[in-house]
């Protein structure tokens, strides 16, 4: 809304929010079921619903003719999907055929690169050592449930094995 972009259509899709109404630019928009999504006639589709949704629907959106921006981790290691941080390599967007998919890097990576790029432009950084600590919630609802179970439920539950080792009280 703040950018006042020329938006003819805005479709909202979800799973747990189906039927919810969102106000945008003076319009009331209802969240529709993503399983029934039709991406035809959409120029851009932004996915910010996790890797499972991205794996199911991003390629469908591209085949329907849309340019897809995926915010999940699903395509981050796919060499055919460019990672784009507009302030860093946004100029590469002009070289990407549409319809297509672009992805964004991990949030820690994006923030770090925003700081390092101007320094690199001045004096060519050759190496950086970084340690980050990511939230369990970034892995999804099943991971947060596993963490909860490991902390509060002492017996009678079965681990989902989202992580290779116990996540509660641990750094992995």
Give each language-model segment a name.
Residues 1-167:
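N-terminal Rossmann-like NAD(P) cofactor-binding subdomain of oxidoreductases
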């Amino acid at each position: 809304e703040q950018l006042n972009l020329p938006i003819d259509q805005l479709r909202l899709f979800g799973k747990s929010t189906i039927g919810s109404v969102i106000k945008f630019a003076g319009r009331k928009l209802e969240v529709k079921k993503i399983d029934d999504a039709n991406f035809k006639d959409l120029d851009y589709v932004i996915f910010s619903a996790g890797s499972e949704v991205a794996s199911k629907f991003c390629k469908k959106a591209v085949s329907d003719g849309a340019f897809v921006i995926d915010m999940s981790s699903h395509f981050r290691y796919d060499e055919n999907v460019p990672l784009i941080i507009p302030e860093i390599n946004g100029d590469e967007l002009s070289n990407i055929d549409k319809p297509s998919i672009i992805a964004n890097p991990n949030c820690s990576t994006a923030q770090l690169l925003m700081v390092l790029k101007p320094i690199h432009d001045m004096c060519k950084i050759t190496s950086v050592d970084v340690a980050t600590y990511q939230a369990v919630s970034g892995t999804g609802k099943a991971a947060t449930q596993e963490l909860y179970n490991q902390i509060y439920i002492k017996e009678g539950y079965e681990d989902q094995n989202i992580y290779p080792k116990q996540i509660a009280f641990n750094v992995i």
